[in-house]
C-alpha cells in the first residue's frame, strides 16, 4: 500500500465516513452538503491520523515499527506537511458546507475538530482517560456534524443519540488499545491510564462502558428511533461486544489487541443495524 494512503488509516477514516452516511440514511436524503460532509470528515480524520503518527513516531518504533514513519517510508517533515494540508482542506470544505446550508455550525465543528485532533496528538493522548474520551468524543462528533449539515431538528436529535453510543464504545476501545500498547508507552514515558492505574482497573472501566452501551442499544428501538430490524441486527453486535468484555478479563497485550478488533467489528455491525433499522425490511 502507498505509504501516504496507509498513514491516513483508511479503515478508521471509512468508519468515520460511515457515521455521516448513517445520518444521511436516517434523513433519507443525499445532497451536495452531505457529500461534502463525507469529504470534510475524510480530510479531518486523515489529518488527525497523520499528525498522530508524526508525534508518536518514537513510540511506534517499538509498538508499530511497520508504520510509514518509523519504517522510513515517509519522512517526519513530509508527514507534518501532509497533515497540515489535510487540515486546511477539511476547513475549506467545512466553509463550503456552511455556505450551502446557511449556518456556520458545520464550519465551526470542522475547525474545532482540526484543533482538537492536533491537540490530541500533541498532548491530550498522553493525558490519562482524557485522551481516550477525546477519541470517543471526536467519533461521536462525526454524527453531530452530519446532523447539522441537514440542519433539521429531528435529524440533529437522532444524530446526538448515535453520537452518545459511539462515544461510549469508542472510549472503551481506546482504553483497550492503551492496555495493548503499554510496553511501548512505558518505554516512551507516556502516562496513559493503564500505566498509572494498572491494566486491571483499566479493563474494569472498559468492560463497564461496553456493558452500558449494550444496555442502551435496545432503547433506540423502544423509543422508536429504529424498527425491529435494527434490534435483530444489533443483537449480533451486542453478542460480539459482550464476548470482548469477557475476554478482557485477561489483560495481556495479545488479548487486548483481539478485543480491540472485536469492538471495531461490533461497531461496524451496529452501524449496519442503524441503517437497516431505518427502513421496513422483512427478513
From Swiss-Prot:
Transmembrane segments: 5-27, 37-57, 85-105, 128-148, 152-172, 203-223, 228-248, 263-283
Single Gene Ontology MF annotation: magnesium ion binding
The entry's keywords: Cell membrane, Lipid biosynthesis, Lipid metabolism, Magnesium, Membrane, Phospholipid biosynthesis, Phospholipid metabolism, Transferase, Transmembrane, Transmembrane helix
Membrane topology qualifier: Multi-pass membrane protein
Predominant cellular place of this UniProt entry's protein: membrane
Reaction(s) the record says it catalyses: sn-3-O-(geranylgeranyl)glycerol 1-phosphate + (2E,6E,10E)-geranylgeranyl diphosphate = 2,3-bis-O-(geranylgeranyl)-sn-glycerol 1-phosphate + diphosphate
InterPro entries, per database record: DGGGP_synth (IPR023547), Prenyltransferase_related (IPR050475), UbiA_prenyltransferase (IPR000537), UbiA_sf (IPR044878)
Pathway annotation: Membrane lipid metabolism; glycerophospholipid metabolism
EC number of the protein: 2.5.1.42
CDD domains registered for this protein in UniProt: PT_UbiA_DGGGPS
Source taxon at top rank: Archaea
Subcellular localization: Cell membrane
Database matches in Pfam families: UbiA (PF01040)
Cofactor(s) essential for the protein: Mg(2+)
Stretches of the chain forming a coiled coil according to its record: none
Gene Ontology cellular-component annotations: plasma membrane
GO biological process, any: glycerophospholipid biosynthetic process
Task of the protein: Prenyltransferase that catalyzes the transfer of the geranylgeranyl moiety of geranylgeranyl diphosphate (GGPP) to the C2 hydroxyl of (S)-3-O-geranylgeranylglyceryl phosphate (GGGP). This reaction is the second ether-bond-formation step in the biosynthesis of archaeal membrane lipids.
Family (UniProt): Belongs to the UbiA prenyltransferase family. DGGGP synthase subfamily.
PANTHER family, alphabetized: CHLOROPHYLL SYNTHASE, CHLOROPHYLL SYNTHASE, CHLOROPLASTIC
Alphabetical list of NCBIfam families matching this protein: PRK12884.1
Protein name according to UniProt: Digeranylgeranylglyceryl phosphate synthase
Native species: Methanobrevibacter smithii (strain ATCC 35061 / DSM 861 / OCM 144 / PS)
